[in-house]
């Protein structure tokens, strides 16, 4: 029984799953909106918000933590320079999920995950 077990495995080994998360967060921070399945969006939403919170701290240690997670160094610069200023007065809730309906091929519930303007 899976009582009080959090997180999703997406039927992948740990390395593949973490790589999936890192790629999706990198894409969200780069394009500021992505269309993905609802379970994946729910899983990466908190990770993306943590990256923006690291950007708001602005310390060298937080920059290094962000560089260890996000694949493209230019996106870390975007988080620390642009997004941190945009969300300076906002205490959290940097993302929005909008339901788009089921996917044509397999019926998976799709959402648009975007950064709040």
From Swiss-Prot:
Keywords: Ribonucleoprotein, Ribosomal protein. The keyword Coiled coil does not apply. GO terms for molecular function: structural constituent of ribosome. The keyword Transmembrane helix does not apply. GO terms for cellular component: cytosolic large ribosomal subunit. It holds the Pfam family Ribosomal_L17. One of its GO terms (biological process) is translation. InterPro entries: Ribosomal_bL17, Ribosomal_bL17_sf. It comes from the Bacteria. Part of the 50S ribosomal subunit. Contacts protein L32. Belongs to the bacterial ribosomal protein bL17 family. HAMAP family: Ribosomal_bL17. This is Large ribosomal subunit protein bL17. It comes from Dehalococcoides mccartyi (strain ATCC BAA-2266 / KCTC 15142 / 195) (Dehalococcoides ethenogenes (strain 195)). The gene is rplQ.
